[in-house]
C-alpha cells in the first residue's frame, strides 16, 4: 500500500512551517547528495505507531495584500483536498478566530476529508485553553492544542492523524495492475499525452472506482495487458503566482508518485531539462520508482542525425542521479511514438520485478572484486562475503561484509554497475543494504 498523505493548511504566520519542521525533524525526505532534488522542505516521511505517512506543507508563499489572503488560502485548501487523505488545519490561538479561517473551514468541511483542527502557539495550557474553545465555532471537530515551538501536544496530534488511516484489514486489496503516473511541470503536455494514449482505438479505457484521492484513475488495457493511469491534474485552476504554481505542482507530484509503480517524467523539448524537471524526477528517484523520461514536443525541434544523441547526453548530464532511466522522444501533438510509451513501461515493469539467484549474484560480485580490489583503511581491507536479493519493486540487495564502514558509496556503485552490466535493470533504481557479519558466521 502507498503511504497516506497528510496536508498542512493555514494562514501565514500561524506556525505551519514551525509545526512541519518540528514534526519532520531529521526524517525529512531529502537526499542531500542527489543533484536536482528539492531541498525546500515541502514534504517529509514520518512514522508514528508503526504507520508511515507523508506530511506535506501547502504553504510557502505569503500573500502581498489582505485581498490576496483568501485566494491564497483557498488554493491551499484546494490542493489539500485534491491530494490528501487527512488535512491538518492550523490556526493561531493568539490571533484568535478570523473570517478567513471560517471561509476555509467551510471548504474543508464540504470536502468530506478528515480534518484535524490544530490550534497552535498554546505554550501554556492553563492560560490559553479558554481561547482554544473559541475555535469550536468552526464546526470541524474538537480543537487540538499544540505548541510547535515547544513541541507540546505532538503525541495527541499524531495519534489523531494515524487514527484516521484505515485499519490494515479494511484497506483496499492490493491491485496487481501496474500504476503509471505521468508527471511534470505545468504546460509540458502531460494531459495531451494522456489524451492521445487514451484516444487510441486499441486502448480500452474505464474509470477506477473507490480510489482514495479525488483525482480519477483510469484503467487501461493495451495488447491484453492492464494498467492504471493516475490522474495528476488535481488542482485544475492555475495560480497567478509562479512560485505558488510550482510548489503546488510538486505537491501534486508527491501525491501521484506515492501511488505509482512507474513514473513518466515529461520534459518540454523546447526548454530542455529545467531545475523543476530535476526536482520532479528527484521525487520519483527518492522513492525508488521506475522512471521514464519522456521528451515531448519533439516535432517542434529541428533535427539532424545527431540530435537525439546530443539531447540524450544532455539529459544524462543534468539528471546524473538517474543513469538508469529510460529516455524516449515523442510528440503528443502528432502522436509520434506516443504508443511506444507502453513498450517502455513494460520494460521497466519487468525490470522492477526481476529476481537474480544468489549464486549468479555472487559470481558477478567475485568477478568484480577480482577486477577492482575492495578499499582498505589503516591496514584493514574490506571483505565482501556474499550478496543476495531480498526484494523487488525495486530490486533490493543485501551485501554482507566484514566492516561496513569500509564499504564506501563508490564501491557499492561499482558493484551496482557490474550487476547492471549483466542484467540491465533499465528504468529502475536498485537498492543496496550493507550488513556486517563475522567471518565464521
Curated annotation (Swiss-Prot):
Sorted UniProt keywords: GTP-binding, Nucleotide-binding, Repeat, Ribosome biogenesis
InterPro entries attached to this UniProt entry: AAA+_ATPase, G_ENGA, GTP-bd, GTPase_Der, KH_dom-like, KH_dom-like_a/b, P-loop_NTPase, Small_GTP-bd
Pfam families xrefs: KH_dom-like (PF14714), MMR_HSR1 (PF01926)
Domain EngA-type G, residue spans: 4-169, 178-353
Residues reported to bind GTP 1: 10-17, 57-61, 120-123
Binding locations of GTP 2: 184-191, 231-235, 296-299
Ranges of residues in domain KH-like: 354-438
Origin superkingdom: Bacteria
Gene3D superfamilies, per database record: 3.30.300.20, P-loop containing nucleotide triphosphate hydrolases
GO biological process: ribosome biogenesis
GO terms, molecular function: ATP hydrolysis activity; GTP binding; ribosome binding
Function (record text): GTPase that plays an essential role in the late steps of ribosome biogenesis.
Family the entry assigns: Belongs to the TRAFAC class TrmE-Era-EngA-EngB-Septin-like GTPase superfamily. EngA (Der) GTPase family.
Name of the protein in its database record: GTPase Der
Species whose genome carries this gene: Lachnoclostridium phytofermentans (strain ATCC 700394 / DSM 18823 / ISDg) (Clostridium phytofermentans)
Lineage: Bacteria, Bacillati, Bacillota, Clostridia, Lachnospirales
